[in-house]
């Protein structure tokens, strides 16, 4: 501390004009050393100021926020992410799940929407189907169907109907036949049958049957058990 006081005293005296007139010529080197020390102190102060300004500039350029503001920004970012996820879930996921859930309901409603079929009849689209579980030949099934509400042995109309019936029935006669293996397949109404029937090599398999594998030919006089036995189908067309 005494050394610093001495230095500043010398600096003050050195700056005083009177002192400069009085000072002996032999102290020239001492004054020069003092001036160098003063210059060094000023230089150090300038460097410290520049370093402080440089740190501030680097801090600003990096975009760093003070801790409270940075925390607030992170919280807002998380909230934005959660809101975006919720919106995406609402837009994409919920309609997809609703569509999947509505598909079985739509099929059920289509199968039961008329609601005017007699008891023990199955409703699908605009038709009613009766399932006769007795083992019968094709001719016996034809006669049994004719005795129920003026219906007849079913003739498959389209692929959708065939797939629906095949999915719930093991096997059943349908109202399609031919006179021989050399004749075309026709319905009991005398119309040409347009769907494919898997034929067999047996010459006497001239009656058509609905099977899980599709439409196949079988012996008209057969009542043998296949899976759960033959099931007779009839259809009563309803007014929509």
UniProtKB/Swiss-Prot annotation:
Tissues showing expression: Natural killer cells.
GO biological process: cellular defense response; positive regulation of natural killer cell mediated cytotoxicity; regulation of natural killer cell activation; stimulatory C-type lectin receptor signaling pathway
Keyword Lipid biosynthesis: no
Domain C-type lectin per the UniProt entry, residue ranges: 116-230
A single MF term (Gene Ontology): transmembrane signaling receptor activity
UniProt cross-references to SUPFAM superfamilies, sorted A to Z: C-type lectin-like (SSF56436)
Transmembrane segments: 71-93
Keywords: Disulfide bond, Glycoprotein, Lectin, Membrane, Receptor, Signal-anchor, Transmembrane, Transmembrane helix
The keyword Protein biosynthesis is annotated on this UniProt entry: no
Annotated S-S bridges: 117-128, 207-220
Membrane topology (UniProt): Single-pass type II membrane protein
Polar residues composition bias: residue spans: 1-12
The organism of origin for this protein: Homo sapiens (Human)
Cellular location(s): Membrane
Residue ranges annotated as Cytoplasmic topological domain: 1-70
Subunit structure: Can form disulfide-bonded heterodimer with CD94.
This protein's name: NKG2-E type II integral membrane protein
Impact upon substituting residue 19 to P: In allele NKG2-E*01 and allele NKG2-E*03; requires 2 nucleotide substitutions
Known glycosylation sites: 100, 149, 179
Gene Ontology CC terms, in alphabetical order: external side of plasma membrane; plasma membrane; receptor complex
Extracellular domain ranges by topology: 94-240
Functional note: Plays a role as a receptor for the recognition of MHC class I HLA-E molecules by NK cells and some cytotoxic T-cells.
Pfam families for the chain: Lectin_C (PF00059)
Domain of life of the native organism: Eukaryota
PANTHER family assigned to the protein according to its UniProt record, in alphabetical order: C-TYPE LECTIN PROTEINS, NKG2-E TYPE II INTEGRAL MEMBRANE PROTEIN
Region of interest called Disordered, as start-end residue ranges on this chain: 1-31
Gene of this entry: KLRC3
């Amino acid at each position: 501390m005494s050394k610093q006081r001495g230095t500043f005293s010398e600096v003050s005296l050195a700056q005083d004009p009177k002192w400069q007139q009085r000072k002996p010529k032999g102290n020239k080197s001492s004054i020069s050393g003092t001036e160098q020390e003063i210059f060094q102190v000023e230089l150090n102060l300038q460097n410290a100021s520049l370093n402080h300004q440089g740190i501030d500039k680097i801090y600003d350029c990096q975009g760093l926020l003070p801790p409270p503001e940075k925390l607030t920004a992170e919280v807002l970012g998380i909230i934005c992410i959660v809101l975006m996820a919720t919106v995406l879930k609402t837009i994409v996921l919920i309609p997809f799940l609703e569509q999947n859930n509505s598909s079985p309901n739509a099929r059920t409603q289509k199968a039961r929407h008329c609601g005017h079929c007699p008891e023990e009849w199955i409703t699908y689209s605009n038709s009613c189907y009766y399932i006769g579980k007795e083992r019968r030949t094709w001719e016996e099934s034809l006669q049994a169907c004719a005795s129920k509400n003026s219906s007849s042995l079913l003739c498959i109309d389209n692929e959708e109907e065939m797939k629906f019936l095949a999915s719930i029935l093991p096997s059943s006669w349908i109202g399609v036949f031919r006179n021989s293996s050399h004749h075309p397949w026709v319905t009991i109404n005398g119309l040409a049958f347009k769907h494919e029937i898997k034929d067999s090599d047996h010459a006497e398999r001239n009656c058509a049957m609905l099977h899980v594998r599709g439409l196949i030919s079988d012996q008209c006089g057969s009542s043998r058990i296949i899976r759960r036995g033959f099931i007779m189908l009839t259809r009563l067309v309803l007014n929509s």
